[in-house]
Amino acid sequence: MKKIIKVEAVEKHFGNQVIIPPLSLDIKEGEFLTILGPSGCGKTTLLRMIAGFETPTKGNLLLDDERINDLPPYKRHMNLVFQHYALFPHMTVEKNICFGMKMQKVSAAEQKERAEEAMRLTQLLEFRNRKPAKLSGGQQQRVAIARAIVNNPRVLLLDEPLGALDFKLRKDLQRELKNLQRNLGITFIYVTHDQEEAMSMSDRIVVMNKGHIEQIGTPKEIYNKPKTLFVATFIGENNIVKNGEGYVAIRPENVKVRSVEEPILKEYHLGHIEDIEFVGNMEKLYVRDEKTSELLMAYQTAEEAAQWSIGDNVYVGWEQEDEVTLN
């Protein structure tokens, strides 16, 4: 897949403070790439540099192998969608979508044709004459996206666009966004702190921490093979266990809990159950390892967990192949 954007040893300083130390990243044409990390990790600053709203202190940004550091945002063939959609309250959906084209002196006929297609793709045709105050949060978000894609951008940049929505609507729109990206075939660069959001939508995820990239990979790679201690603790749940000079991560679903009446395997330790949590179709056991004093998490089905009570002595362990060594 062709690389559309290259970030080459880019740095961003604010005064004496280094927000992003040298950072490099290749973004493929047509992919859904998510930049994921906690608040203050530099993800929005990176997005704003790609968009042209911030200038790199050092390094180069390339679009189709052309340096764009000094190119203004409106010449980059990119559009940015913010969490707060900035819709014009006095304009209808259709007029909001057409506003940018009107400023660019696009003919009325072409405005109508392109707006029609954008509204069709975002399922807004029936709302074309409504004003933002008469729309739900999800509909407003779709208007913001329609307004962005109507200009046929090469890249769509999205800065936590679902952050202000309730859980159910957010889940529905995650699916809509991914389907929209597939239909459009354009590159999406999506910024979020929500790991579940990143996992459900992305082709690849860039995990950031303190201005650095910790890991780049597919959702499955990030989940199953975290490379660093930060990724292992930030993405999903992991048991982090000291192993010599370093650490290994074991997902709770790979930790086995057995009765003390069963023959013990050499990899298993004696422990006792400190707590049991109901988590939907599973139960989460918290087991204190008597040998290491580690508190381990293990998932079991409700049927499997029915045999246990808080305080029970058990054997706890896992297969070596389920350990992931961390840097």
From Swiss-Prot:
Molecular function terms from GO: ABC-type putrescine transporter activity; ATP binding; ATP hydrolysis activity
Membrane topology: Peripheral membrane protein
Keyword set includes Membrane: yes
EC number: 7.6.2.11
Catalysis: reaction(s): ATP + H2O + polyamine-[polyamine-binding protein]Side 1 = ADP + phosphate + polyamineSide 2 + [polyamine-binding protein]Side 1
Coiled-coil annotated residue ranges, if any: none
Stated role: Part of the ABC transporter complex PotABCD involved in spermidine/putrescine import. Responsible for energy coupling to the transport system.
Record's protein name: Spermidine/putrescine import ATP-binding protein PotA
Organism: Bacillus cereus (strain ATCC 14579 / DSM 31 / CCUG 7414 / JCM 2152 / NBRC 15305 / NCIMB 9373 / NCTC 2599 / NRRL B-3711)
Organism placement in taxonomy: Bacteria, Bacillati, Bacillota, Bacilli, Bacillales
Gene from which this protein is expressed: potA
